[in-house]
Amino acid sequence: MQEKKINRTNVQLEALEIAKANKRCGLAISMGVGKTRIAIQHLQYCYNPLIEVLVVVPTHAIAGSWFTELDKLNLGNLSKHITFTTYISLKKHNPNDYDIVYLDECHSLLYNHEIFLSQFKGKILGLTGTPPKHSDSEKGIMVSKYCPIKYKFTVDQATDSNILNNYKIIVHQLELSKTSSLKKSKKNGGQWFTSEFKDYHYVSNRVAQANPGKQKQFAAIMRMRALMQYNTKELYVKSLANKLNTKCIIFANTQKQ
């Protein structure tokens, strides 16, 4: 018996059937497989002339992928039924205004999103490429409660099926500058200078000394933000980009980058 070939369309159809069969569920699907397209096809399935849906995204930049996909499918008319918001602004919306909520990057869910979700009575479809690893974590608990993962298709599966090209991970060690050229601001409006090396050592110590939980999470975010601002990192990434001779995807923390 010939083994069924797995391709992008097969995965999308399988995931869509799962979404149709569950009032609330999550789809954990690798990047490059078409999570946004699945969500739009789900909206098509649920469509009625009065339907109103809320798409929740980490940043408004991600909303662009929805408009791009709507255009590809020649479904631009659906956009008038869609409202976009960020996870930060979710609580500003009235749960009674929407029939469906699409949680794009649903691994971003936190306890404070209960303000909206606990009152929302409609359908929820969560989309993620990186579902929470720990079911007892804040994100794991929220995903399990509001959009439990019912379908998985990992990056490895996508690669093995030739949906994605094979990839390799290269860890680059960055040598931070020891020159005192990094400008920092004081609370009183003043400024002072330090080196990237000293600054990273300082923020790393803050992470090490932070209490477990939210304090450590916040300290880790501040360390990441510090690293994003280092000129050495930007110059090094640009030097790598200049050496590229094959097609690739470049991920950045912000649209500006």
Predicted features along the sequence, with ranges:
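Conserved helicase motor "Helicase C" RecA-like lobe of SF1/SF2 P-loop NTPases
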Residues: 249-257
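SF2 helicase catalytic motif II
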Residues: 94-133
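Short hydrophobic/aromatic beta-strand immediately N-terminal to the Walker A/P-loop
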Residues: 25-28, 54, 249
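Inter-Walker segment of RecA-like/P-loop motor cores
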Residues: 56, 60-97
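Interdomain helical connector at the RecA1-RecA2 junction of SF1/SF2 helicase-like NTPases
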Residues: 137-246
